[in-house]
Every structure is written in structure tokens, then in C-alpha cells.
């Protein structure tokens, strides 16, 4: 593989504690990884050269929460919600019906389209979930489709109890035959621990069964109200608890005292007209915070991590640096991919070469110029995937 030197970087955000934020910087990409970082004046020769011409550069976005194996459209539900109808997660069943009716090829094409859409906006690492099949066969095929395209795959058979099914009998199915069918194709298991979905005991059963099969744990929790999601995630050592819209002080303290990441999904809260999470309370308490898109056809149909960063800065009292770290390193931490060989969400020698250059001299422009497309050029695994 050829090497590339990206030089003339006006401001380089690395997320590395030793390197920090550099000015007039350069980096070298070789064999899909970062090979060197330092001053532009000291940049070594490479096979190819890209002059950033004073633009800002940073790690590619790490989107640690999406639902991209789906078919169909829920525009009517969105319009009804904007007209005052409350969001209660019931529309998931609409997507389940459409997804079951779609072919594998149709699901794969839709997934690839959304990953490409995200990449054009700077996202270089994507987690996605099953959860719109809710039968053994449909969850398995969703997992297979996702594993062929996404960086990380999560089993979410416990997304909703299918219409007409008994909740406890469905949990039995998820914990047994369904998990056995999908486990070879996924790295994670998630559960929607919320009123109207799965209670704490049911959620614990699913997560315990997944852990016994060697899967990492994640939780949808505290989206529609206070509840047991955060406490359960911390108790079981889940890598992340996602949404965190409604938190008690004990929830905040529990997250701050644990390795569980609080993954915030502001685009979802805006779309469902929920309050935005209290990111400031979490950060001030010492919790690790991630930002993710929650891209899905119902409650958050956006792949724009930049939009989430902008919202976090303008509406959630996060600084630009905090929001960028949450959307890169934080997402990587939520997937346990922030350290070691082939790390993402960070720029340092040895890390995966996922780099985005902005059409801006500073990352502050992500919030300073809201709504303006600022992605200039993107490299994923050292390969230039988009650029002006």
C-alpha cells in the first residue's frame, strides 16, 4: 500500500494525551495506519502528498449507535409527532414489517447507502444493530447483512416484544434459540430496557445470556423516563448505556464511578421532542460521554455526527473540544476500540488511519457555522473515501 503525507494542517486534534492539539502539523498514513505525526516542516517523504492548506483535521467520527438494517419509511409517524402526537416507540413495529418483507440484497444495499452517506460527512467507523426482524430467521439474516458492511454489529432482538407475543415467552426465545443463531455474527448484545419494552428482570436475563456466549453488553436506557436502565448497565459492566435522557443523581454518580459510557443521542431527543440529556452534569461528575447519531427510520433519521456535535455545543453546554472527543474517542470507548492496536477515535502512530479534514481553519467552526457542510476530505483505513 502506498504512503500518504497530509501536510499543512492548520489545527490537528489528535485525542492523544501526549500529542494533544497541534498547529502547522502533518501526519503520514501507511498500510492503513498512522505512521507519523509532527510539525509540517519535519514531515517525511511519502508516495503521495495532500496539502490541507491550513484546514483543521481530526479523527473520523465514530458512530457507536445506529439501526441501519431496515426497510421502509416512517415519514407519516414523524409528521404526526411534529403535530403533537407523543413518541412511545410503537412505530418500531412498522419497520419490523417492512424489514421482514425486504430481501437480503435490498437490506444490504440500504445499509451500504447509509454508511456511504455517513462517510461523506466524516464518519469512518460505524456500529449498527439488528432489531427489526424479531424472529430467529430475520434476526440472523440482519446480523449476517450487518457483519458484511459495518465495523461493529450488535444483536438487538430485545428491541420490542412482537405484536401478539407473550413477553416472557419472547424473552425465552431471545435468550435461547435467537442468541444461538446470531452470536457467531455479532460482537455485542443490546436490550431496550424501558417501560413498554423490557423491564429490568427481562433485560437482565437477556444480557446475562449474551455474556455467557461471550458477547459484550450494551443497554438502551432512560430514554422515555427515569428507570432501571443505567443501574442495570453499571451492575452488569455494560460498555455503554445509550440515551440517558432522564437521569437521577444516583444514575449520574453510578456512571461516574464506573467504566460504562453514557452515550447521548441528541438527534433522537430533538426528533421525539424530548429534553436533551444533561451532558454537563455527566462530564462534571467524571463520567465518560459519547455522542452518536442513533440513525434509524423512526426516531432519528440522520447520519450526521456533525449535527450531533453542533447540538451538543449549542444546546447541551458541552465545549467544542468535549463534543468532538465524545463523537470520536468517546464512541470508540463505548465500543472498547479506543486503545491498543488498530485503535479508532484517536490519531497517533499505530492507530487506524481514519482522518477527516474540514473546510475550516478550526474545529470550532463545527458549532460556529451550524448547518454548513464542512467535511472536505476523509480517509478511512488510510484510503481516501471522499474529498473535494
From Swiss-Prot:
GO terms for biological process: L-histidine catabolic process to glutamate and formamide; L-histidine catabolic process to glutamate and formate. Its EC number is 3.5.2.7. Keywords: Cytoplasm, Histidine metabolism, Hydrolase, Iron, Metal-binding, Zinc. Its cofactor is Zn(2+); Fe(3+). It comes from the Bacteria. 4-imidazolone-5-propanoate binds at residues 74, 132, 159, 299. Pathway: Amino-acid degradation; L-histidine degradation into L-glutamate; N-formimidoyl-L-glutamate from L-histidine: step 3/3. InterPro entries: Amidohydro-rel, HutI, Metal-dep_hydrolase_composite, Metal_Hydrolase. Fe(3+) binds at residues 65, 67, 220. N-formimidoyl-L-glutamate binds at residues 132, 296, 298. The keyword Kinase does not apply. Binds 1 zinc or iron ion per subunit. One of its GO terms (cellular component) is cytoplasm. It is found in: Cytoplasm. One of its GO terms (molecular function) is iron ion binding. It catalyses: 4-imidazolone-5-propanoate + H2O = N-formimidoyl-L-glutamate. Zn(2+) binds at residues 65, 67, 220. Gene3D superfamilies: Metal-dependent hydrolases (3.20.20.140), Urease, subunit C, domain 1 (2.30.40.10). Catalyzes the hydrolytic cleavage of the carbon-nitrogen bond in imidazolone-5-propanoate to yield N-formimidoyl-L-glutamate. It is the third step in the universal histidine degradation pathway. NCBIfam families: hutI. Belongs to the metallo-dependent hydrolases superfamily. HutI family. This is Imidazolonepropionase. It comes from Saccharopolyspora erythraea (strain ATCC 11635 / DSM 40517 / JCM 4748 / NBRC 13426 / NCIMB 8594 / NRRL 2338). The gene is hutI.
Amino acid at each position: 500500500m502506498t504512503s500518504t503525507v497530509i501536510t499543512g494542517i492548520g489545527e490537528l486534534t489528535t485525542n492523544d494525551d501526549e500529542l494533544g492539539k497541534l498547529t502547522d502539523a502533518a501526519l503520514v498514513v501507511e498500510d492503513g495506519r498512522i505512521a507519523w505525526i509532527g510539525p509540517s516542516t519535519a514531515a517525511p517523504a511519502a508516495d503521495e502528498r495532500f496539502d490541507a492548506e491550513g484546514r483543521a483535521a481530526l479523527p473520523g467520527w465514530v458512530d457507536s449507535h445506529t439501526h441501519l438494517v431496515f426497510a421502509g419509511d416512517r415519514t407519516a409517524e414523524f409528521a404526526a409527532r411534529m403535530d403533537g402526537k407523543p413518541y412511545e416507540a410503537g412505530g418500531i413495529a412498522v419497520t419490523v414489517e417492512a424489514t421482514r418483507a425486504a430481501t437480503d440484497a435490498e437490506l444490504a444495499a440500504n445499509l451500504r447507502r447509509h454508511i456511504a452517506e455517513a462517510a461523506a460527512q466524516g464518519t469512518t467507523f460505524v456500529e449498527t444493530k439488528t432489531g427489526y426482524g424479531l424472529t430467529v430467521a430475520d434476526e440472523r439474516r440482519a446480523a449476517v447483512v450487518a457483519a458484511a458492511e459495518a465495523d461493529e454489529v450488535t444483536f438487538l432482538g430485545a428491541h420490542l416484544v412482537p405484536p401478539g407475543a407473550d413477553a416472557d415467552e419472547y424473552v425465552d426465545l431471545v435468550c435461547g434459540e435467537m442468541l444461538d443463531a446470531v452470536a457467531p455474527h455479532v460482537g455485542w448484545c443490546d436490550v431496550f430496557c424501558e417501560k413498554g419494552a423490557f423491564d429490568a428482570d427481562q433485560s437482565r436475563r437477556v444480557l446475562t445470556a449474551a455474556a455467557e456466549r461471550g458477547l459484550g453488553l450494551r443497554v438502551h436506557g432512560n430514554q422515555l423516563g427515569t428507570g432501571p436502565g443505567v443501574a442495570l448497565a453499571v451492575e452488569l459492566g455494560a460498555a455503554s448505556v445509550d440515551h440517558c435522557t432522564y437521569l437521577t443523581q444516583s444514575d449520574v454518580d453510578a456512571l461516574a464511578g464506573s467504566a460504562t459510557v453514557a452515550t447521548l443521542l441528541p438527534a433522537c431527543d430533538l426528533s421525539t421532542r424530548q429534553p436533551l440529556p444533561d451532558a454537563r452534569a455527566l462530564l462534571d461528575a467524571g463520567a465518560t460521554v459519547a455522542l452518536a447519531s442513533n440513525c434509524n427510520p423512526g426516531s432519528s433519521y440522520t447520519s450526521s455526527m456533525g449535527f450531533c456535535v453542533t447540538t451538543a455545543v449549542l444546546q447541551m453546554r458541552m465545549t467544542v473540544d468535549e463534543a468532538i472527543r465524545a463523537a470520536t474517542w468517546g464512541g470508540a470507548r463505548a465500543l472498547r476500540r479506543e486503545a491498543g492496536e488498530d485503535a479508532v477515535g484517536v490519531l497517533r502512530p499505530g492507530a487506524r488511519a481514519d482522518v477527516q479534514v474540514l473546510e475550516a481553519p478550526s474545529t470550532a467552526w463545527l458549532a460556529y457555522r451550524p448547518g454548513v457542510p464542512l467535511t472536505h476530505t476523509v480517509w478511512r483505513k488510510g484510503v481516501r473515501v471522499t474529498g473535494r
